[in-house]
Amino acid sequence: MSVTIEDIARSAANWSIEVTPAGATKIDSFADALAEGTTVNVTFLPGSDPLDTIAISKRLADEGMNAVPHIAARSLQDSAQLDDLLKRMTAEANVREVLVIGGGVDKPVGEFDSTMQVLNTGLIQKYGITTIGVSGHPEGSPDISDEQLAVAIEQKNEFARKEGISLYMETQFCFDANAVLAWEKSIRQAGSQLPIRIGIPGPATIKTLFRFAQISGIGPSMRFIAKQARNVAKLMTVQSPHELLAGLSAGMAADKDCLLQHFHYYPFGGFAKTAAYAHAVEQGNIKLLPKGGFEVAPE
């Protein structure tokens, strides 16, 4: 599929980015790296304090960003804790959007085992949150079977219809555009209507990407980056997601019904560097390459 600079810039608009509470302490000013209103997800990692997630969400809101804190189901104690966290998120950080995930914990620490259990409490709606993200898995999950994933997508679509709430899927990071496009088409044909934010690995060394892929990546993406990492001489080479973005943009432009809507960046190579790259792509400050993909034009 062919793609134009306009296709890529259009697909890259309204991107979002991720930050950990620990990583946020190294960022002096979010406003220096991001345009006002940029969506920034704040993680709630296993073993971390959810109050740190709220504190960074408040800081982001104070700097004019749309803070989207994670709610990790299997890291919550009970409904009372969930209620308290949502109350704090909305009152202290003016949160109006959250991302609800299962969370990377083998054994739940409390009463919740899945995203749907959190959604079905009704507590998110109680606090006036109008937009909810849930996780998507284009390449499957090491913890959940494909059949279970299909059922979960069906349940989330039904929840969105029943509650009349804006629900979207945000995915793990990927490297293979064809795998993502095939997954999107398959879940759409199965009846899913949820818009999708695709996880994009920001520019980083192959060594760094391989490390994160070992933790999270499976399927085509893991094979792709493992092949790159075999060349020791290239381990410290910075790899950008230009071919992935071009491939996804081509697929989005070619299919008006495609559910892919936005890109969500994982800043593995640095927050400011990833934000600058995402902004350049969104602005169309790129040059198409003869063999596919593009390069960011020098300023």
Positions of PLM-derived features:
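Active-site beta->alpha loop and helix N-cap motifs at the rims of alpha/beta catalytic domains
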Residues: 2-153, 158, 270
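Glycine- and other small-residue-rich loops at beta-strand/loop junctions that grip anionic moieties
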Residues: 19, 45, 74, 145, ...
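Active-site pocket-lining/capping segments in soluble small-molecule metabolic enzymes
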Residues: 19-21, 101, 114-138, 152-158, ...
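Short, well-ordered secondary-structure micro-motifs
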Residues: 110-111, 144-146, 181-182, 207-215, ...
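Flexible, glycine/charged-enriched surface loops at secondary-structure junctions
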Residues: 255-261
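A short, acidic, flexible beta-alpha connecting loop/helix-capping segment that sits on the rim
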Residues: 265-273
